[in-house]
Amino acid sequence: MKTSNFTLLILLFFQVFRLTAQEKDILIGGEQLKYRIHLGFINAAEANIRSSSNLGSIRQIPTRKIEIEGKTLGIFNVFSPLLDVWVSHIDPSTLLPVKAEMNKREGRYRKQEVVDFYHDKGIAQISSPQNSPKDKNLAISNSMLDLISGYYFLRKKNLQDLEIGQKMSAKILVDGQVYEIWCVVKGFEKVESKFGTKNCIRTSLVLPKNNLFQDKDAIRLWISQDNYQIPFKMEVNLKIGFLSIDLEDYKIAGKTIYTALP
């Protein structure tokens, strides 16, 4: 399995924050989530997401910095090491990205990219030393998202109002390409975990046609049915095997939100 696929799955996992959420301040400062990723029975990778405690400012726009880090572990880190860092600076008032940064280290492959979003002008300025040309402008809609801001936008929706069969979508800009991702509500289930039994909403993610996943219902995702509404568990049928992503830890401002069973 290519290491870059781990990062794709990690970011898709976090996309659902944007697809399911309460009507409240969802850009929580000091939020930290840790996930463990298994390929079959192998502990393959981990992912961490962190939000800054304080607001910053870019072009005089208040922003919250969100960072996602994905890295391989164990045998995967020996033969196919990955350390990817994705950063988004999001305007809390609109939940749109102001600036996005990417730093990929996958084996010998390296790529850095910075995207500045000018939604009022309908332009994204993309800069990468690995691109040719290095700098380019891309026409975008006034509501275009990046991968991480896609993590929040529809989180404004109240999970309790969702119905089985309901569909939600988000359009995101990745590597100079625009993709549309759909989230379909499949049902409500209890999920067993290290934190005990958790009530969750089960969804499926539908992606553009690709060679990575086995079928249309290949990505199944469970979202916690509580005040936090976070991605809790994910299962993926890949063409080369079975992958699972499980919540390992969740904190806000250093305080543990979910306590593991003894």
Across the structure, where does each feature detected by a protein language model lie?
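Alpha-helical structural elements
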Residues: 9-12, 30, 146-148
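Acidic, serine/threonine-rich low-complexity disordered tracts
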Residues: 22-119, 158-262
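Hydrophobic, well-structured mid-protein blocks that either form specific transmembrane helices
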Residues: 113-155
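Bacterial Sec-dependent N-terminal signal peptides
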Residues: 1-24
